[in-house]
């Protein structure tokens, strides 16, 4: 998989989750923050990243930098995905199903952010297993990265597209 250059893309970012952890010390409590950020150009490129810092804006900035390093290309066929797929990450599973034009993005919280920034307009999803936002985002991106168009499958199998589509 080749690396995608984030500097040439017009990326939008969305903060999906901000977590606060507390370390109790003799002098009181120390707070640190983690931010889960999704970036995408709404045209087939999407990535997620985690940033951790003592202040929320710093954590978000680090998350955006990390997300830009983890961009993937998503094959989009007529505003939806080419085929059904289940993405897994840890205990989180996300079922992604193609949908007819006009359906819209039927997805819960963290999954919706990933799909909208990927540029997918019509899709049905179901979260199975863990509802942890971090696992759901990673599972969605893992599922999207496994998608292949009919042309790619035909090339891999040395067949024509008509033979693949039946």
Curated annotation (Swiss-Prot):
GO terms for molecular function: rRNA binding; structural constituent of ribosome. It comes from the Bacteria. SUPFAM superfamilies: dsRNA-binding domain-like (SSF54768), Ribosomal protein S5 domain 2-like (SSF54211). The N-terminal domain interacts with the head of the 30S subunit; the C-terminal domain interacts with the body and contacts protein S4. The interaction surface between S4 and S5 is involved in control of translational fidelity. Belongs to the universal ribosomal protein uS5 family. With S4 and S12 plays an important role in translational accuracy. Located at the back of the 30S subunit body where it stabilizes the conformation of the head with respect to the body. This is Small ribosomal subunit protein uS5. It comes from Acetivibrio thermocellus (strain ATCC 27405 / DSM 1237 / JCM 9322 / NBRC 103400 / NCIMB 10682 / NRRL B-4536 / VPI 7372) (Clostridium thermocellum). The gene is rpsE.
């Amino acid at each position: 998989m080749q690396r995608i250059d984030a500097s040439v893309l017009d990326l939008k970012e969305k903060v999906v989750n901000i977590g606060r952890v507390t370390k109790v010390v003799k002098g009181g409590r120390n707070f640190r923050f983690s931010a889960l950020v999704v970036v995408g150009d709404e045209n087939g490129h999407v990535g997620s990243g985690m940033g951790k810092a003592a202040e929320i804006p710093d954590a978000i900035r680090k998350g955006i930098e990390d997300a830009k390093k983890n961009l993937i290309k998503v094959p989009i066929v007529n505003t939806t995905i080419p085929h059904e797929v289940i993405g897994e990450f840890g205990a989180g599973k996300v079922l992604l199903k193609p949908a007819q034009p006009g359906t819209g993005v039927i997805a819960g919280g963290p999954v919706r952010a990933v799909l909208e920034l990927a540029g997918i307009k019509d899709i049905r999803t179901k979260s199975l297993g863990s509802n942890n936002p971090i696992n759901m985002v990673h599972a969605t991106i893992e599922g999207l990265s496994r998608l292949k168009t009919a042309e790619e499958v035909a090339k891999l199998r040395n067949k024509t597209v008509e033979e693949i589509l039946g």
